[in-house]
Amino acid sequence: MLFTVSCSKMSSIVDRDDSSIFDGLVEEDDKDKAKRVSRNKSEKKRRDQFNVLIKELGSMLPGNARKMDKSTVLQKSIDFLRKHKEITAQSDASEIRQDWKPTFLSNEEFTQLMLEALDGFFLAIMTDGSIIYVSESVTSLLEHLPSDLVDQSIFNFIPEGEHSEVYKILSTHLLESDSLTPEYLKSKNQLEFCCHMLRGTIDPKEPSTYEYVKFIGNFKSLNSVSSSAHNGFEGTIQRTHRPSYEDRVCFVATVRLATPQFIKEMCTVEEPNEEFASRHSLEWKFLFLDHRAPPIIGYLPFEVLGTSGYDYYHVDDLENLAKCHEHLMQYGKGKSCYYRFLTKGQQWIWLQTHYYITYHQWNSRPEFIVCTHTVVSYAEVRAERRRELSIEESLPEIAADKSQDSGSDNRINTVSLKEALERFDHSPTPSASSRSSRKSSHTAVSDPSSTPTKIPTDTSTPPRQHLPAHEKMVQRRSSFSSQSINSQSVGSSLTQPVMSQATNLPIPQGMSQFQFSAQLGAMQHLKDQLEQRTRMIEANIHRQQEELRKIQEQLQMVHGQGLQMFLQQPNPGLNFGSVQLSSGNSSNIQQLAPINMQGQVVPTNQIQSGMNTGHIGTTQHMIQQQTLQSTSTQSQQNVLSGHSQQTSLPSQTQSTLTAPLYNTMVISQPAAGSMVQIPSSMPQNSTQSAAVTTFTQDRQIRFSQGQQLVTKLVTAPVACGAVMVPSTMLMGQVVTAYPTFATQQQQSQTLSVTQQRQQQSSQEQQLTSVQQPSQAQLTQPPQQFLQTSRLLHGNPSTQLILSAAFPLQQSTFPQSHHQQHQSQQQQQLSRHRTDSLPDPSKVQPQ
């Protein structure tokens, strides 16, 4: 019994120990798990922090367009730090360690502050005047960009009257020492002189203004300058700029303004595209200014609140800004022009503003104007202004000048300073430089060395006036256009001597190499102008020849269509009376034999161009028609006397013309109906000449200022023997085509029997006198306008043809005129029956 109790106690103790051991193990596992979790959390936190730092470091490295791994980021960071350490060591070596320089300022900052305080800028030039370096502070003082001055000659920015003096100063100071030793360069080479320098302008057409400045500096040898401190000079300086014995020597100077400027433009922009915001009332008063404004403009918000924005604008920009604000009030938003804003440091800074009007959300009334101001550089402003003025930027021109000048410098040998000084003694205006820039084309002043202030350009007093390049081109073109050049040989004969002179011209003894190169360039420009003028003259000659050829073709076409007369009539015979070919000169009058036509074609009369004032005058036309009657009675036909028509031909043509111009056309064969209009003049009296038709080379036909009548010639398929007459003579009656000739209609009446007989007898006498071979010169007074009673009689078929041939002309007259014509026609028909009876005294016996 006792043994049993002890065994049970032992078993309970063993169970208790096992449970305690298990519990201890579980507790240890929990502790390890907690430690592991905390360790993992800390490790993850460390990795995340490391990744953030690597990412931030990679964002600061250049060339981070693609994603870089950690090793690349670390490698680039190491390279950057190594280079930065080297640069820092070099800057520490050249750091100014003087008591007068604050230790908290770097060299660049101290230099900029000193230049602003002195109203000056740094300038490094070679001994021949070539500029190799200029500081950025030149923009705020002379309104030049550094790129405008670098690689240019200093003499391009100095008046011509001071060229010789400045050149002597730069050259003679070097010649004081035989050898450029380091001791001389350190001790005795300080140089000071004063002169005028050209101010820059946005618009090159503005008058040039010069600023009186003072140069203070010394000569430096580029050999003693370390390669890291060259600042790119080595690539800028060309070998042709350095004479042999003065190699790698330049004059470094501080250029100061004699008259200080109290308000200057800010020369540089630290960070481009800097901007700040502001709010303005509708009266343009400041209501709000954000935190980005004070570092830019210098004002704190409380200093500008309540003030007008116009208090800070430049006076020259107020007009343009007012227009921009008017546009804003009309459209609600917009962008301003470039304008200057006065900073707290009394400097002008260029800004451009984007603005819009905000409205109240309940009543939609305008509340205020929100503005975003952006800082712009002077280079952007000048480029934009010149684009608005359609002026090319000077940078391409400078590049072109550099390429041209480098070639000219290679061709011209550099002369020594001693020879240059000898030329100074013999020549009043020595050489300046072989370079020529666009700036020098605006400089024109007399000797201004005695004027210590700003001097505007005087364009009237100096003998040598410089003009812009486009004005020179205009003057040269006007001078060339004023000279009359009539052929191609003139232009070619002018260009060839100029070219030979430009290639073979020797250099005069008293002229420098640079002046000769300038003259050579001028002669080359003159040659180009002459060649251009020659091409223009050749084009004009070809155009005139083409016009002359077309005029000749038109004249031949007119004569081929309407001026050849065909007559095919089986029985009747037509005799054309005297045809007179007259001219303005009585010695040139030629007589033509009468033309007898029996159904033949009229031969053409050749008219030579030697008749400069020749006129073709058809003085008389006698048409006699023999009727086929059994009684063999011959009756005379009324005379159709056409008015004189004169045609003036150009004396330059050597072509020939066909038969004389007639107002009537005789058609021999059937043809398609056509209409030809020939203007004819209505003479006022018997002493006036007929209409003059002048054919000129401008393809126009001009007529005299007298009264004109358009005679319509209608050709239609008619039978042989029909005689076509002008439509102004309608069925035997004179018709006035224009109301202005109503006064002459009263004079147009039918001829009586006695007048017809007298006219017939006089015309027969003239006909017989023309046929004599030794007849003297004929003089015929101008004929009056066509006055006749009848054209044809005794032939009803012919009258029907005439009435059918002119239906258009009859329909054009008013009804009242038509009735009047019919009444007059009936009276004349009855009168003609009595007039057509043959005269017994003139009837030939059978």
Swiss-Prot record:
UniProt domain PAS: residue ranges: 107-177, 262-332
Region (Interaction with SIRT1): 450-570
EC category name: transferase
Gene Ontology terms describing biological process: circadian regulation of gene expression; DNA damage response; negative regulation of DNA-templated transcription; negative regulation of nuclear receptor-mediated glucocorticoid signaling pathway; positive regulation of DNA-templated transcription; positive regulation of NF-kappaB transcription factor activity; proteasome-mediated ubiquitin-dependent protein catabolic process; protein acetylation
Polar residues compositional bias, start-end: 447-463
Record PTM Phosphoserine, positions in chain: S38, S42, S408, S427, S431
Sequence segments annotated as region (Implicated in the circadian rhythmicity): 514-564
bHLH domain ranges (all copies): 34-84
Record flagged with keyword Transmembrane: no
UniProt feature, compositional bias: Low complexity: 478-493, 624-637, 644-654, 811-829
InterPro entries assigned: bHLH_dom, CLOCK-like, HLH_DNA-bd_sf, Nuc_translocat, PAC, PAS, PAS-like_dom_sf, PAS_fold
Motif Nuclear localization signal: where in chain: 32-47
Primary location recorded for the protein, binned into one broad class: cytoplasm
Chain positions covered by the region annotation Interaction with NR3C1: 371-845
Reactions that this protein is recorded to catalyse: L-lysyl-[protein] + acetyl-CoA = N(6)-acetyl-L-lysyl-[protein] + CoA + H(+)
Phosphothreonine carried by residues: T451, T461
PAC domain location: 336-379
Pfam family membership, one: PAS_11
One Gene Ontology term, aspect cellular component: transcription regulator complex
Molecular function in Gene Ontology: chromatin DNA binding; DNA binding; DNA-binding transcription factor activity; DNA-binding transcription factor activity, RNA polymerase II-specific; E-box binding; histone acetyltransferase activity; protein dimerization activity; RNA polymerase II cis-regulatory region sequence-specific DNA binding
Primary role: Transcriptional activator which forms a core component of the circadian clock. The circadian clock, an internal time-keeping system, regulates various physiological processes through the generation of approximately 24 hour circadian rhythms in gene expression, which are translated into rhythms in metabolism and behavior. It is derived from the Latin roots 'circa' (about) and 'diem' (day) and acts as an important regulator of a wide array of physiological functions including metabolism, sleep, body temperature, blood pressure, endocrine, immune, cardiovascular, and renal function.
Xref: PANTHER family: CIRCADIAN LOCOMOTER OUTPUT CYCLES PROTEIN KAPUT
Name of the protein in its database record: Circadian locomoter output cycles protein kaput
Organism: Pongo abelii (Sumatran orangutan)
Species classification: Eukaryota, Metazoa, Chordata, Craniata, Vertebrata
Primary gene name: CLOCK
